[in-house]
């Protein structure tokens, strides 16, 4: 059996995998164990009571975190005319149409978010094989296809997170960084859960939010007592 590292021993001593911690204690514990030499991302996994094999139970959406993600977001926008001008005014990192599509097909893909105005989807649609596998394909459900291009760019720059249930019915999202205080992380988590509740499929029966786990990039998952979040 492989020998445990000092960090692994510390985590094993501090985290009881069979215990669900009050949310504030869970967040404090995750921050305490985030000891890497960089500000680790604080992430949440939310297990939903849905059947992701059914198309009407796929949960997909976006949330503007009130305290952001702590990450500087690179945003590309497909738009023209006034929408292109508005995107540039909001700080988009790249704005264009066919020219931007050609650059992306050539490998220029170092963006966190790709946004498109509805009239640009004819151009963007051809990029499905390039953007789709990277989770960058614009979609109305996540607010990345929008007539309000300026607002979409503003939200992305402010720390909007996008998510979709995986094959196990779990949503994964960042809620901040290890250098955030617990209150900021809590506010971000509350905002995410509020939006997830709004997205509950009408065909989903029983308990909707079944489990919540928070973790840092290099740390262990810490289960959260749902009752302390009111869900």
Swiss-Prot record:
- CDD domains (UniProt xref): Ribosomal_L1
- Please tell me whether the keyword rRNA processing is annotated for this protein: no
User: What Pfam families does the annotation carry?
Assistant: Ribosomal_L1
GO cellular component terms, semicolon-separated: cytosolic large ribosomal subunit
- Biological process (GO), any one: regulation of translation
Outline what the protein does.
Binds directly to 23S rRNA. The L1 stalk is quite mobile in the ribosome, and is involved in E site tRNA release. Protein L1 is also a translational repressor protein, it controls the translation of the L11 operon by binding to its mRNA.
Homology family: Belongs to the universal ribosomal protein uL1 family.
| HAMAP family per record | Ribosomal_uL1_B
Self-association and partners? Part of the 50S ribosomal subunit.
Protein name from the UniProt record: Large ribosomal subunit protein uL1
């Amino acid at each position: 059996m492989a020998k445990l590292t000092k960090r692994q021993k510390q985590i094993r001593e501090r985290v009881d995998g069979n215990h669900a911690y009050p949310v504030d204690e869970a967040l404090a514990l995750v921050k305490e164990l985030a000891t890497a030499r960089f500000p680790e991302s604080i992430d949440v996994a939310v297990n939903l009571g849905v059947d992701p094999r059914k198309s009407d139970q796929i949960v997909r959406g976006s949330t503007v975190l009130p305290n952001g993600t702590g990450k500087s977001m690179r945003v590309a926008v497909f738009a023209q005319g006034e929408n292109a001008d508005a995107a540039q005014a909001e700080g988009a990192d790249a704005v264009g149409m066919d020219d931007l599509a050609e650059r992306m097909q050539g490998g220029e893909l170092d963006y966190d978010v790709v946004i498109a105005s509805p009239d640009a989807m004819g151009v963007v649609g051809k990029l499905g094989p390039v953007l789709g596998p990277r989770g960058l394909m614009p979609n109305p459900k996540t607010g990345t296809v929008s007539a309000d291009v300026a607002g979409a760019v503003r939200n992305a720059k402010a720390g909007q997170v996008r998510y979709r249930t995986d094959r196990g019915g779990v949503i994964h999202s960042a809620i901040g960084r290890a250098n955030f205080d617990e209150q900021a992380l809590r506010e971000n988590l509350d905002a995410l859960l509020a939006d997830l509740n709004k997205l509950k499929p009408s065909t989903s029966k029983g308990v909707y939010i079944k489990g919540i786990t928070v973790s840092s990039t290099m740390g262990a998952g810490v289960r959260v007592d749902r009752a302390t979040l009111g869900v």
